[in-house]
């Protein structure tokens, strides 16, 4: 299952060969409640709850809890000439899910011993979403992106790498965080 919380709010659920998509939308990014879909911060940087009231045969009451402290990834800056095209940073965290899902009335138990997940939150300037400023648009020559958060018994590792279209590494970060918060 993929849960995303952006300006748009898609929920994607796949069961066997069936895939269901549900979107709720509101342009107010501070509003964590759209229709029957809401996100609650139970404990900052540790625990969140996602509730979907029955909508088109889907319902959920899920709690995500971080297994480790958040990992703050290094700042990522890309330029094209003197123009900054990307200046962003994020935090990532691995954890587990608990609660229940309902698909067309069938209840699915979600247990933290088998439902592992990750979350991240990024901020900054990115070449997506908003219109290009006036002037010549930046050329895009492609990129390679690797983002791998991993959870183990005693620690988590978050790997993030990016190369531009010429194969030049523009981001190279790997962080291990232990259960006691050591990095």
Protein language model annotation of sequence segments:
Residues 1-183:
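Structured soluble/peripheral alpha/beta segments that form catalytic or ligand/cofactor-binding pockets
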């Amino acid at each position: 299952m993929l849960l995303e919380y952006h300006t748009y709010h898609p929920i994607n659920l796949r069961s066997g060969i069936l895939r269901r998509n549900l979107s709720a939308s509101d342009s107010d990014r501070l509003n964590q409640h759209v229709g029957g879909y809401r996100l609650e911060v139970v404990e900052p940087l540790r625990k969140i709850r996602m509730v979907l009231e029955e909508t088109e045969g889907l319902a959920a009451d899920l709690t995500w809890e971080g297994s480790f402290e958040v990992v703050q990834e290094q700042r990522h800056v890309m330029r094209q000439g003197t123009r900054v095209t990307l200046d962003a940073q994020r935090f990532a965290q691995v954890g587990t899910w608990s609660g229940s899902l309902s698909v067309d009335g069938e209840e699915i138990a979600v247990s933290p011993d088998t439902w592992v997940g990750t979350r991240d939150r990024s901020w900054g300037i990115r070449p997506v979403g908003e219109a290009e400023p006036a002037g010549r648009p930046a050329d895009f020559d492609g990129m390679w992106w690797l983002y791998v958060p991993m959870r183990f018994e005693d620690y988590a590792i978050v790997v993030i790498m990016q190369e531009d279209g010429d194969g030049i590494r523009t981001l190279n970060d790997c962080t291990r965080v232990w259960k006691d918060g050591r990095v």
